[in-house]
Amino acid sequence: MGNVWSLTSQMFPPKPKWTVDDMPDLTGKVVIVTGGNTGCGKESVRVLLLHGAKVYLAARSEGKAKEAIEDLKKETGHEAIFLPLDLADLVSVRRGAEEFLSKEKQLHILFNNAGVMLSPMEMLTKQGYDLQFGTNVIGHFHFTKLVLPALLAAATPTEKARVITTSSSANYMGTLNFDLWADGPARNKKAPGDMYVQSKHGNVVFAVELARRYGAQNIISHSLNPGSIRTDLQRHLSPFANKMQDIFLFPVSMGALTQLWAGTSPEAGQMNGEFMIPWARLGKARKETGDPEVGKKLWEWLEAQCKDY
């Protein structure tokens, strides 16, 4: 009952008590936003630029990224920096991390914002994983680990570095099944919705485990449900489903709010390994996401998948 209540109650959150006007000045801070060319990512980049941050907009499509950068420059007067990153290809992930590290010694905030939702089951990553789990979890894990030296270099006891990972209310709808993530008979019995739940639950487990492993080194790691937001994530839904969903969806300005709060507010900087809910509030993920044994198992599994890339 608790998981169902958490899921449904977050669809209609109370009015926010925190807005982007409450964000601190971010001059001198280096930030990466994955999936920054569209949706909540693009809105987050916009607000971060307005608050003085140096922002790397990480995206797969150079054309779409540069179009977004131009739009944002016209709107804010500041220019984000394109970082090529295809989270569905672990080789591309390494190249993207290496390009960033060749330009910057420090990374103050990483927003693991990009995501794939309800993609057809025949769609796989370059290395043969389910596209949703591979992009949302494996790709972000690999990228985070590779840029960790820059996060650690930026982190101090008074100014901790932050990693903010976007999950969703789908984390409440199931637990991890390690047999489903690579292409094979077990996965092929499942539907896109099942795999989305796997990835969003996995996002929270990863974020909690990151906090557990690196909190003592001044790394803050939170995950969040951005809310029910009108974005390109719905592109794999049917026109009818999109129309029905649209009734319940909020604009991206609201969708970016919770991750910006988690990534920049002093209040969120006093916590670690937490799950944030709309709008800009502390919440609770499904209890299994905090199990240290599950976190350790997932982390070690992810390391094994990424070690050759």
Curated annotation (Swiss-Prot):
Gene Ontology MF: a single term: oxidoreductase activity
Cysteine-cysteine disulfides: none
Active site per the UniProt annotation: 167 (proton donor), 196 (proton acceptor), 200 (lowers pka of active site tyr)
Protein name, per record: Short-chain dehydrogenase/reductase ARMGADRAFT_1048226
Keyword terms, alphabetized: NADP, Oxidoreductase
Pathway(s) it belongs to: Secondary metabolite biosynthesis
Enzyme Commission number: 1.1.1.-
